[in-house]
Amino acid sequence: MQAVSVGLFLFSMTWAAPKLNEDGSSGGNQGNIHLASVKPEPMVGKGTEGGRDAPLHLLDQNRQGATLLRNITQPVKSLVTGTEVQSDRNKEKKPQSVLSVIPTDVHNTNDYSEDTENQQRDLLLQNSPGQSKHTPRARRSTHYLTHLPQIRKILSDFEDSASPDLLVRGDNDVPPFSGDGQHFMHTPDRGGAVGSDPESSAGHPVSGSSNVEIVDPHTNGLGSNEIPGREGHIGGAYATRGKTAQGAGSADVSLVEGSNEITGSTKFRELPGKEGNRVDASSQNAHQGKVEFHYPQAPSKEKVKGGSREHTGKAGYNEIPKSSKGGASKDAEESKGNQVTLTESQRFPGKGKGQSSHSLGNEVKSEEDSSNSLSREGIAIAHRRTSHPTRNRGMSQRRGSWASRRPHPHRRVSTRQRDSSESSSSGSSSESSGD
């Protein structure tokens, strides 16, 4: 629009006023409406200065002004409308400049309308279906909270006692699961879980004639190491010792809940053999699960006296003869062997039928020869010197200087004699202590 209006304006100027171009004054002022309308005054001045044809120039200027006004009115109007359109576009782009031009009353009315629109918008948001979605969620949550207490009462332990008060899930018709494939029922007087069949679940046989008992230490008030009571159970669902007949070697085993210990009691009176008859009534069931060893009685003194020679006769080269007491070592017997032989030789001068008569004398001589050492080698050397004088003479006659080096069989014979003498001394020491 602006380019069209400017083109029309220039065409009208060139067609309506050709004389203005001749003067040169309007050549630099083309395209300016206000300068073209105001320029007649300097033109009049120029005409007066020249002094030539001044009234003619004035008439011509008036005519030209009238024609200019007639021809310029339309393009000027179109130009004004273009500027107004351009200003409207600027107002849309920059609202702050528009507010500065708008009067205060109009501005207040606009604010009031905006406030009302905001209020209506808030009301629509409150009543909108998108906002109303929160209300059914709240209702659902409250409805879910009403069922929470029932779900919280479900037992976490499957093997615990199932009380009918806590089962609020609607599955009371199904008995609680114990974890091992057996259904349990609740006995309110005991407070524990008992088998559905009292007779079948009373006792499970363990290794023949033994009985197994399930005992709750919290109800009885007994410790884990104490034997629970066998009578007085309420409900009759627990096994007692008197229900089943027990054999001679039977033992009761009780499994205590809450502990890993097994307490048991054995009737020694009913055990086969002599051990059952030797147990006192006070010592029965006193071990509380511990193992007691009952050793046989010590043999009589006649057996000790008669058995000592049998032991000495059967003792080998490397075997140690066992005494009846079993407490004294062989080294202690060797250290005291000399004193024992002296006392026995004084007490029992006629003893020694099973042995040679020179054995005791050899011990006395060995004490004189080996006074500094009581070891096994010293005693063996003493036996070699004094045990067989006839053999020593023969060996000296045969070999001469080689008599000291004897073969091994002779050494074995000497050690056997020494062992027999030591065993006899140990047997005699046991006899003396027994007397």
UniProtKB/Swiss-Prot annotation:
A cellular-component GO term for this protein: extracellular region
Compartments where found: Secreted, Extracellular space, Extracellular matrix; Secreted
Compositional bias segments (type: Polar residues): 337-346
Residues in the signal sequence: 1-16
Pfam families, alphabetized: Osteoregulin
GO molecular function: extracellular matrix protein binding
Major location category of this protein: secreted
InterPro entries assigned: MEPE
Induction field: Induced by dexamethasone.
Biased composition (Low complexity): 422-435
Tissue: Expressed in osteoblasts and osteocytes.
Record comment regarding domains: The acidic serine aspartate-rich MEPE-associated (ASARM) motif is sufficient when phosphorylated to inhibit bone mineralization by osteoblasts and cartilage mineralization by chondrocytes by binding hydroxyapatite crystals during the mineralization stage. It can also inhibit dentin mineralization. The dentonin region is sufficient to promote dental pulp stem cell proliferation. It can also stimulate bone formation, osteoblast differentiation, and activate integrin signaling pathways.
Quaternary structure and partners: Interacts (via ASARM motif) with PHEX; the interaction is zinc-dependent.
Sequence similarity: Belongs to the PF07175/osteoregulin family.
UniProt name for this protein: Matrix extracellular phosphoglycoprotein
Species assigned in the record: Rattus norvegicus
Annotated gene: Mepe
